[in-house]
Structures are given as C-alpha cells and as structure tokens.
Amino acid sequence: TDGGSGNLSVPADGYYKLTIDIAALTYTLVPVAAPTDTYTNVSIIGTVNGDDFVTDKQLTKSAFDPHLWYISGAELSAGEFKFRANNSWDTNWGTNSEYFGTGTKGGANIPLASEWTYDIYFNDATGDYTIIPVQ
C-alpha cells in the first residue's frame, strides 16, 4: 500500500497461478502442475488473416518460458480465429471472448470486431490470451 512492501516470494521453483484482487489490494499465489505438452510452434488461423482458415500467422516463443507466445504488430481483419499448435487442427484453442480470455482446447472461434494492428499474447499451458490494439 505504501510502496514499501517486499518482493513476492515462492517456496520452490515451479509454476504458480497468481490471482490479484485490485479492489481489495490482495493476491493469492497457488502452485500448479507443470505443463507436460510442448509445441514446436503456435499460430493464429482464421478469417482475420484475410482468408477462410487457410493461412497460419506464426507467433514467437518466449525466450524465458516455452509456454508463452506472442506476435507484435499483427495486421488483422475483422473476423474470427483460433490459436493452434504445430500448424495442425489436432490441438487448437478458442472461446467466444474478444480481447482477452481463456481458450479451451477445441473451443469456439475467437471473434475480432475491428480491422486493426494488434499485439497478441498467448499461454499454451493455460489457454489465457490477451489481444491489444496498438494502432
């Protein structure tokens, strides 16, 4: 509250889910199982790429976590899309929430109402994504 609080600490190396309640100024940090699936690549595919689910737009894997992916300055059309692994429909994520949400494997197409330039962030372990209009 005064900016003098200590750093967050964890009892052991591993994956954790951090939940923040901004209104109450509280947080919880809960250990979660390490993901077992890893992917060579993750992409977005859909009508937002200017075609009908034909062309993949590749995301870049994070240098510090193999489950975090991003793309900066993606020019997308209004439409819908899904995230998918290894350019295959075997593993894909989606939901019906536009700018942020948690995609489920085999879920609905993600809507995008406006043609724009976006930065996109995706976590293949949780399905969480964020889409940020940048221009």
What is each stretch, according to the model?
Residues 1-4, 35-78, 86-108:
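Aromatic-rich carbohydrate-binding modules that target alpha-glucans
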Residues 1-24, 90-126:
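Structured interaction patches on ligand/partner-binding surfaces of diverse proteins
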Residues 27-29, 127-135:
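Short, low-complexity, Pro/Ser/Thr/Gly-rich segments in the mature regions of secreted, periplasmic
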Residues 33-36, 135:
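Bacterial Sec-dependent N-terminal signal peptides
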